[in-house]
Design a protein with these regions (language model features):
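Carbohydrate-associated surface elements
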Residues: 170, 191
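Nucleotide-activated donor-binding/catalytic signature segment of Leloir-type glycosyltransferases, i.e.
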Residues: 251, 259-285
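Nucleotide-sugar donor phosphate/pyrophosphate-binding loop at the beta->alpha transition
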Residues: 86-93, 125-130, 138-157
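Conserved acidic donor-binding segment of nucleotide-sugar-dependent glycosyltransferases
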Residues: 336-347, 355-360
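Conserved donor-binding/catalytic core segment of Leloir-type glycosyltransferases
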Residues: 212-237, 249, 366
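Short hydrophobic beta-strand element within catalytic cores of glycosyltransferases
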Residues: 293-296, 314-324
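A short, well-ordered alpha-helix in the C-terminal region of glycosyltransferases
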Residues: 361-375, 387
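A short helix/loop element that forms part of the nucleotide-sugar donor recognition site in Leloir-type
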Residues: 198-211
Length: 396
C-alpha cells in the first residue's frame, strides 16, 4: 500500500504517538508512507523566520529501526492566526501534489484543516480517507474564539470520512455523537512492545539518578502540560508531612518545566523532585524500571476527559501500579481491579502512593496492570490497522 498521512503537529519533534508506532511498523512490512505535517511548535524556535520554506526530509525512525518515512512540511507564514490561512493554502497545494504524484491508495488524517482539504480532494479522485482520532481535536485549538469553527469542521470531517478509527471507546462514542456513522467507526487501541522493555536496568538507572534502594519513585513521562497535575504532586512532596523517601521523577518537557525547576531550589528538594528533559524512546524502559509507581494526575478537563494516553499502556506493560485521576476515558478503558488505582484529584496522589507503599500491595497491583494490557501487542494492533486500511481500499 501507498499511504499518505496528513496531520497538524510536528512529526519530527513530537512523539512517538500512535501514528509513529503504526506507520513505522507498516513501513517495516513493505508499505510506503509519506507524511504531510505542520510545525505546531514554531513559536518556540528563537531563530524562526516569518516565512518558513517547504521542507522535504527523510526522518529517522522513533520506534522501529530502519523504518524511514518521508515527511513533507509545506511552506508556512509563521505569524499568529495568519498561520491558519497560510496552512489552508500551502497544505492544499501539497495535498494535491502528493495525490497526483505519489498516488496513495489511502489517506489517513489526524488533524482538522488539512483533513478537511484531504477529504475533499480524495472524494474527487475516489481515494478512501480514514480519520484516526486520539483527541477531541477542536479542544486542542489554543484560541477559544476558533474552537467553535474547528468543531464544525471536525464534525463535517466525521460525516464525510470513509472510516473513523478511535484509540478508545470513549472517543468512539464522541465521534458518533459528532456525526460519524456508527457502522463506519471502529476502535483500534494503543499497543505495547514487551521486547522494548526486556533489557531495562533498574539498579543502574536508580544509581545514575541518585535514588536509594528504599525510595518510592512516582514516575511521569510526556509533555508537562499545565493541567498535567504535576505541580500539585510536587507541592505535596514538598510538604513537611510527606515521607522523604517519596520522590517524583518526571521525564519530558513543557509548560511546567520551569515551575518544577523553581520547586527544586527549595531546601532539600533537588533530590526529591527529579526532572529529566526529553529522552530518546529507546531509553524510556530504564526510567520505567527505576520507578515504583506510575502516575497520571491530570485534571478532568475537556481535553483529557475522553482520552487514554499511550503512556498508560506503557506504564502497565512495565508491571507498575498506576495512580490516575478519575478521567472518564481511562476509567471506561481499564475499569477497576486491573492495575489502575483512582483518586479524585492530583492532590490525592502522594497520599495514595504512601498508602500503597505501606500496605504492601504495589507488586500485586503491578501484576494486574501488566496482565490487563498483554493482549495489546503492537504487532497484533498493526495487523488490525493494516487489515482495516485494506478493507476500505477494497470497498472503493
Amino acid at each position: 500500500m501507498k499511504i499518505l498521512v496528513v496531520q497538524e503537529s510536528n512529526w519530527v519533534a513530537k512523539g512517538p504517538h500512535q501514528s509513529h508506532h503504526l506507520m513505522e511498523r507498516l513501513v517495516s512490512r513493505g508499505h510506503e508512507v509519506r507524511v504531510i505535517d505542520f510545525d505546531i511548535v514554531w513559536r518556540r524556535n528563537p531563530d524562526r523566520k516569518i516565512l518558513s520554506p517547504r521542507l522535504e526530509m527523510q526522518t529517522p525512525p522513533k520506534v522501529i529501526p530502519g523504518a524511514t518515512i518521508t515527511v513533507i512540511r509545506p511552506a508556512i507564514i509563521q505569524l499568529p492566526l495568519i498561520e491558519y490561512l497560510s496552512l489552508l493554502s500551502s497544505h492544499r497545494k501539497e495535498i494535491i501534489r502528493q495525490l497526483d504524484t505519489f498516488r496513495p491508495d489511502v489517506v489517513v488524517g489526524f488533524g482538522i484543516l488539512n483533513a478537511e482539504i484531504a477529504i475533499s480532494q480524495c472524494r474527487s479522485r475516489n481515494i478512501p480517507f480514514v480519520y484516526y482520532i486520539i483527541d477531541e481535536l477542536h479542544r486542542l485549538v489554543p484560541q477559544p474564539l476558533f474552537q467553535g469553527i474547528a468543531r464544525s469542521i471536525e464534525r463535517s470531517n466525521y460525516e464525510r470520512s470513509d472510516l473513523v478509527l478511535s484509540i478508545n471507546e470513549g472517543l468512539r462514542d464522541y465521534t458518533i455523537g459528532m456525526g460519524a456513522a456508527r457502522e463506519k467507526t471502529r476502535v483500534i487501541r494503543a499497543g505495547i512492545d514487551l521486547d522494548w522493555l526486556k533489557h531495562a536496568d533498574r539498579e543502574k538507572k536508580r544509581e545514575e539518578l541518585g535514588i536509594s534502594l528504599d525510595d518510592i519513585v512516582l514516575f511521569f513521562m510526556g509533555w508537562l502540560y499545565e493541567f498535567s497535575g504535576l505541580r500539585e504532586v510536587a507541592r505535596d512532596i514538598i510538604k513537611n508531612d510527606a515521607p522523604k523517601k517519596i520522590k517524583l521523577l518526571a521525564v519530558g518537557e513543557g509548560e511546567l518545566w520551569d515551575p518544577l525547576q523553581q520547586m527544586k531550589t527549595l531546601d532539600g528538594m533537588n533530590d526529591r523532585i527529579i526532572t529529566v528533559g526529553w529522552q530518546p524512546y529507546a531509553t524510556i524502559p530504564d526510567f520505567l524500571a527505576a520507578s515504583d509507581i506510575c502516575i497520571l494526575p491530570a485534571k478532568n478537563n475537556e481535553i483529557m476527559r475522553n482520552i487514554v494516553p499511550i503512556k498508560m499502556y506503557e506504564y502497565m506493560a512495565a508491571g507498575k501500579p498506576v495512580i490516575a485521576t478519575k478521567l472518564p476515558g481511562v476509567m471506561k478503558e481499564f475499569g477497576t481491579g486491573n492495575g489502575v488505582v483512582y483518586v479524585d484529584d492530583a492532590e490525592d496522589v502522594v497520599h495514595k502512593a504512601i498508602e500503597l507503599s505501606q500496605n504492601g500491595s504495589m507488586a500485586e497491583i503491578g501484576v494486574k496492570a501488566r496482565q490487563c494490557v498483554l493482549s495489546n501487542d503492537w504487532n497484533t494492533i498493526t495487523d488490525t490497522f493494516e487489515k482495516a486500511l485494506g478493507e476500505v481500499i477494497h470497498v472503493r
